[in-house]
């Protein structure tokens, strides 16, 4: 990185570069290196361990498909669990729904403080969480896998908003974690996680999908372009019980006025490139007409 640009490299020497004005803060927490930059055209940028996490002008392109796909598919989401999400974008989107309560479990308090003080994409929710002022939400500073392993509560939806599967986030991509998540869901429940760049981290996406498919009753892999990431970006959803992941509640969706995720084009998210579809079929040898792959 020169003094004017931030570059994140992906496999194959393929990168994404942004022109920056200045570095706002750099801090080494117990778990990760956290940086915030002011970019030339995209507002503030959050970087963790050298990887772009979000751009202020465009972060909804990640948070909307992560959150609203599952919350609009679930017929009655009342209790939600977020693992990670310290920047505040995921809980901001969750609280736009008529839920009863959301539990947010974040391992690193430093990312919350930095996001609250410098990013400010959360509409004040992080401050309210820390000060116990948000009646529909609670914040727990804890390792997500330890929390869900010992959790006695039952949730309708579990959303994992983590960094890529390295260092502190690696256990969140393990079969054990997915087993705990399945157990923590109600008899009709949904789970979702990000799974990396489809083209440049293909094996990560396939591995994540494969593990979730082994644990959940159904599994779906879908993609959406994300500003600041090498897109298309992949997401994997796991279904417990009888929930039709093809069916979106369009009446609820109309009230949200989303900017990036289009519920009316929900099925388009699941159109996979031919090479990946063939790869999944060779591995699992079953499909339905919605490009989901069942165990």
What does each model-identified segment do?
Residues 1-35, 210, 233-295:
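SAM/dcSAM-binding transferase cores
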Residues 19-22, 32, 145, 220-224:
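Glycine-rich, charged/polar anion/phosphate-binding loops
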Residues 27-29, 130-133, 230:
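Solvent-exposed alpha-helices and their adjacent loops that cap or buttress functional pockets
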Residues 27, 139-142, 219:
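Short gly/ser/thr-rich secondary-structure transition/capping motifs
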Residues 169-245:
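C-terminal substrate-binding/active-site "lid" region of AdoMet-derived donor-dependent transferases
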Residues 1-72, 96:
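Rossmann-like AdoMet
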Residues 2-3, 54-190, 200-204, 208:
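The AdoMet/dcAdoMet-binding core of the Class I SAM-like
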Residues 30, 40, 106, 229-232:
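A short, structural micro-pattern
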């Amino acid at each position: 990185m020169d003094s004017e640009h931030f570059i994140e490299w992906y496999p194959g020497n393929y990168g994404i570069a942004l022109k920056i004005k200045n570095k706002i803060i750099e801090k080494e927490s117990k778990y990760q290196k956290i940086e915030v930059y002011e970019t030339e055209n995209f507002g503030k940028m959050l970087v963790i361990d050298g990887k772009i996490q979000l751009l202020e002008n465009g972060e909804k392109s990640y948070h909307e498909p992560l959150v609203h796909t599952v919350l609009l598919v679930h017929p009655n989401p009342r209790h939600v669990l977020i693992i990670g999400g310290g920047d505040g974008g995921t809980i901001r989107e969750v609280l736009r729904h008529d839920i009863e309560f959301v539990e947010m479990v974040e391992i690193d308090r430093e990312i919350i403080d930095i996001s609250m003080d410098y990013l400010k994409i959360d509409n004040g929710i992080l401050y309210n969480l820390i000060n116990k002022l948000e009646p529909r939400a609670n914040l727990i500073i804890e390792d997500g896998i330890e929390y869900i392993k010992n959790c006695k509560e039952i949730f309708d939806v579990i959303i994992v908003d983590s960094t890529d599967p390295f260092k502190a986030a690696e256990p969140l991509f393990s079969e054990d974690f997915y087993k705990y998540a399945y157990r923590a869901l109600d008899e009709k429940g949904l789970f979702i996680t990000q799974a990396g760049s489809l083209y440049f981290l293909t094996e990560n996406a396939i591995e994540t999908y494969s593990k979730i498919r082994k644990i959940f009753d159904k599994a779906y892999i879908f993609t959406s372009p994300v500003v600041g990431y090498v897109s298309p970006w992949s997401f994997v959803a796991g279904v417990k019980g009888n929930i039709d992941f093809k069916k979106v509640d369009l009446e609820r969706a109309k009230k949200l006025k989303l900017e990036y995720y289009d519920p009316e084009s929900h099925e388009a998210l699941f159109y996979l490139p031919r090479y990946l579809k063939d790869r999944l079929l060779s591995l699992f040898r079953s499909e339905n007409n919605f490009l989901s792959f069942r165990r």
